[in-house]
């Protein structure tokens, strides 16, 4: 699970950056 956290943060960051 912990290995998924950086990917989730990356995805959220990309979405936030797109907004």
UniProtKB/Swiss-Prot annotation:
Subcellular localization(s) per the UniProt record: Secreted
Record keywords, A-Z: Amidation, Amphibian defense peptide, Antimicrobial, Secreted
A Gene Ontology term for the protein's cellular component: extracellular region
GO terms, biological process: defense response
Tissue localization of expression: Expressed by the skin glands.
Function: Has antimicrobial activity.
Similarity field: Belongs to the frog skin active peptide (FSAP) family. Phylloseptin subfamily.
Name of the molecule in the record: Phylloseptin-J6
Annotated source species: Phasmahyla jandaia
């Amino acid at each position: 699970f912990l290995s998924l956290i950086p990917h989730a943060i990356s995805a959220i960051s990309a979405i936030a950056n797109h907004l």
